[in-house]
Amino acid sequence: MTLTRRRFAGVLLGAGAALAAPVRAWARKPKASPAAHYEKLRSGAVVCRLCPHECRVGPGRRGLCGVRENRGGKYYTLVYGQPCSLHVDPIEKKPLFHYLPGSQALSLATAGCNFSCRFCQNWEISQRRPEELDAIDLPPQAVVRLARQRRCPVIAHTYSEPVVFFEYVRDCAALGREQGVPNVMISNGFIQKEPLRELCRHLGAVKIDLKAFGEPFYREQCGGALKPVLDTLLTVRAEKPWLEVVV
């Protein structure tokens, strides 16, 4: 699912994309943007409150996902506006079967994941750090514009794990909602309630991969836990975006 610089250029040129912001491929030097949902500690460490791992991250270190870094006691995301995978897919490929059926979805992902599934289909990007992959500068405004140019009525955050590029999903979804291009999130559901509720205010649909029905499987095969995922299902249902579950 990784894209080389040449393939990225082909996608964008094929779209006839005249983006207002310049599009540049980069590797090895991810840009830092302020992260949301974390707590500062007196020691200079931070505690990430984005997902149930609640990583305690010392200065100069990263969380388990590999895409969020403590710099001088402040937490930053290293993947904001910097997708490493970009494609146009049928929405059923997500899979979402009952939300805008028959539509083409502008689909994107960044590096990183908060799970380490032994059976991951997209491990080439989900289990990599951002500096290990080529990516492009594609801010939310450009994402929505590109979706319109490609005549995609929906934007899908997919392939890796949208939870770890929370800020990018949030801003794309908010802008897309304003401009009539809904966003959907294809997720493992391993996220804290507060950031999930924030996303649900903007998302058109959420699809959760329910990988198993037991804690041992989640712990041993995914590096996560089942209970927070079940809590996510209840929260999404209560917040009212369209919800689909794939087992």
Where are these regions (language model features)?
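N-terminal secretory signal peptides and thylakoid transit peptides that target proteins
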Residues: 1-15
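Hydrophobic h-region of N-terminal signal peptides that target proteins for export
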Residues: 16-22
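C-terminal segment of N-terminal export signals and the immediately downstream linker at the start
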Residues: 22-57
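Local cysteine-cluster metal-coordination motifs and their immediate loop/turn environment
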Residues: 46-67, 111-123
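Conserved Radical SAM active-site core
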Residues: 70-205, 214
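Alpha-helix N-cap and loop-to-helix initiation/capping positions
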Residues: 135, 220-228
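Conserved C-terminal portion of the radical SAM core fold
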Residues: 227-247
